Curated annotation (Swiss-Prot):
The gene is Fau. PROSITE patterns: UBIQUITIN_1, UBIQUITIN_2. GO terms for molecular function: protein tag activity; structural constituent of ribosome; ubiquitin protein ligase binding. Belongs to the ubiquitin family. This is Ubiquitin-like protein FUBI.
Amino acid sequence: MQLFVRAQELHTLEVTGQETVAQIKAHVASLEGIAPEDQVVLLAGSPLEDEATLGQCGVEALTTLEVAGRMLGG
């Protein structure tokens, strides 16, 4: 299925739903150079846990995930 990831740019990823959020962060790191530990992946404004699979998070085809940077001291 296709998934959209909006970080600094909008990216289209081909995924199965079995990928973990940590794997998506690693992919975003390779595309944009943002370290995985500095990323927060959001689905409808709610942060997703690194260990969870996309399927467990309720991610469906054509979903857009937002990637935000962690705020220091926030």
